[in-house]
């Protein structure tokens, strides 16, 4: 007697899907289908599955039939349960903790996905399929893989014995259409006055460092800043995993290469930075500076390659410059700390700190100017800040972007480059009517000081 089956993760649904899957494997020579186009092979299997479902006599709606057929096709040709998540353009991250615990990130907030794998072996098979398609392998001798899918998505996989609870998979999806500065303004990540300053900074060939934590939106902002580079300039991009989507015509994209199975052939970012200097670049854009390449990047900025852009993992502008100092020491060059700080202060013009707030929104926290040196200390001044006022009833972070009232020294360089900013852009004028009554009752968050030394604790 036929029983009603809801197409979900129930045992009855999984049993039916497994039975149909086994029958397809038994009745079709899948190897013979490999030479066919995927559309042709999928159509043949879809027809077979439809006939099999008719024979099963299971009462199912047309939508349920379509879902179960698609699910089996995903198992045969795609990445199994991950396929609908990969196809959903509203999802930015897919995080597989265990075979039955899969989370997604949508609009900066994590949610349970509702999908699951049959068991650890099923998850391991999908991971192996993913990494093998990009020419990589994962096994006990090489239990970690960091790779890029053909569509640009970043994949990180780790398996036992390093992953204690079973195979783990993280996918950072690649946006087909890069966000623009208008998008960031609409999302509340930055304001139009800040965009004007950043556009002018790029045109005037200021060296810009973007700082933030994981998932804060560093690459997104770097992509936006890179879009401001004039189209008649030659750009060389250097990335560990290619994510930038530059629209200019004259772009050379470089990407690091991991070692092969024999442990040979590794090419790191430092080698690419050094090589890029021989490629007659007008601009060098480093996706993220992580190690010894920091010294070569700083030297490039100080020797005629103005207008370079990069990002770094750090929690504040001060930490960002301190991290650069640490990374320079990884190069093996024994330079005095004061000499390294002089290199940094003369190379970096602007530091942008961004963060992901508790409500999932990504915002620019500070736009700071590197002023110079006082003794052996780098000094900075904040030009724009995001002033947090508290948390609203709906969990949204309340706050506003405002200038600090300090006119940056780099405005002279902008004027020389033909960039004229509106008068009063840097004046700190309180919002009309002052702070809203509701906001005054919320807990306040201290605003960072306007000028901060780098090289000693505040």
Region annotations inferred by a language model:
Residues 1-111:
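N-terminal anchoring/assembly modules that precede and organize ATP-driven motor systems
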Residues 32-35, 55-62, 77-88, 130-147, ...:
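Active-site phosphate-binding and catalytic loops of NTP-dependent enzymes
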Residues 88, 96, 101, 105-204, ...:
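P-loop NTP-binding catalytic core
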Residues 175-186, 203, 223-274, 320-324:
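P-loop NTPase switch/communication element
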Residues 210:
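Hydrophobic anchor at the beta1->P-loop junction of P-loop NTPases
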Residues 218:
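Conserved lysine of the Walker
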Residues 239-252, 276-375:
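Conserved P-loop NTPase nucleotide-binding/switch module
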Residues 363-458:
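NTP-binding/hydrolysis catalytic cores, primarily Walker-type P-loop NTPases
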């Amino acid at each position: 007697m036929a029983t009603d089956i809801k197409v979900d993760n129930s045992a009855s649904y999984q049993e039916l899907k497994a039975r149909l899957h086994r029958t397809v494997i038994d009745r079709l020579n899948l190897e013979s289908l490999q030479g066919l186009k995927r559309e042709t092979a999928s159509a043949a299997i879809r027809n077979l599955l439809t006939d099999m479902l008719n024979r099963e006599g299971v009462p199912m709606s047309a939508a349920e039939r379509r879902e179960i057929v698609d699910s089996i096709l995903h198992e045969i040709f795609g990445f199994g349960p991950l396929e609908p998540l990969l196809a959903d353009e509203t999802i930015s991250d897919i995080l597989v903790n265990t075979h039955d615990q899969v989370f997604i990130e949508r609009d900066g907030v994590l949610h349970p996905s509702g999908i699951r794998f049959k068991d650890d072996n099923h998850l391991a098979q999908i991971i192996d399929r993913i990494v093998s398609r990009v020419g990589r392998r994962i096994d006990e001798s090489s239990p970690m893989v960091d790779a890029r899918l053909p569509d640009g998505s970043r994949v990180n996989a780790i398996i036992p014995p390093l992953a204690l609870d079973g195979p783990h998979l993280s996918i950072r999806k690649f946006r087909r259409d890069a966000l623009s500065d208008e998008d960031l303004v609409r999302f509340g990540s930055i304001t139009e006055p800040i965009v004007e300053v950043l556009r002018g900074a790029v045109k005037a060939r200021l060296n810009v460092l973007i700082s933030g934590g994981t998932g804060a939106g560093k690459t997104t902002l770097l992509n936006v800043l890179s879009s401001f580079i004039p189209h008649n300039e030659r750009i060389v991009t250097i990335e560990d995993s290619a994510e930038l989507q530059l629209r200019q015509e004259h772009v050379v994209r470089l990407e690091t290469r991991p070692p092969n199975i024999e442990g040979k052939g590794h090419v790191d970012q430092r080698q690419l930075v050094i090589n890029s200097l021989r490629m007659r670049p007008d601009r060098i854009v480093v996706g993220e500076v992580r190690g010894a390449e920091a010294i070569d990047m700083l030297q490039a900025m100080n020797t005629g390659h103005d207008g370079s852009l990069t990002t770094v993992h750090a929690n504040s502008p001060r930490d960002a410059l301190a991290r650069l100092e640490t990374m320079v020491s990884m190069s093996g060059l024994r330079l005095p700390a004061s000499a390294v700080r002089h290199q940094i202060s003369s190379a970096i013009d602007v530091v942008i700190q961004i963060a992901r707030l508790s409500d999932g929104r990504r915002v620019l926290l500070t736009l700071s100017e590197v002023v110079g040196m006082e003794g052996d200390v780098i000094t900075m001044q904040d030009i724009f800040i995001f002033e947090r006022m508290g948390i609203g009833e709906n969990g949204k972070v309340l706050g506003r972007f405002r200038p600090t009232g300090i006119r940056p020294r780099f405005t002279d360089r902008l004027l020389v480059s033909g960039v004229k900013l509106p008068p009063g852009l840097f004046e700190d004028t309180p919002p009309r009517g002052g702070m809203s009554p509701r906001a005054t009752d919320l807990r306040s968050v201290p605003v960072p000081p306007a000028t901060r030394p780098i090289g000693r604790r505040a």
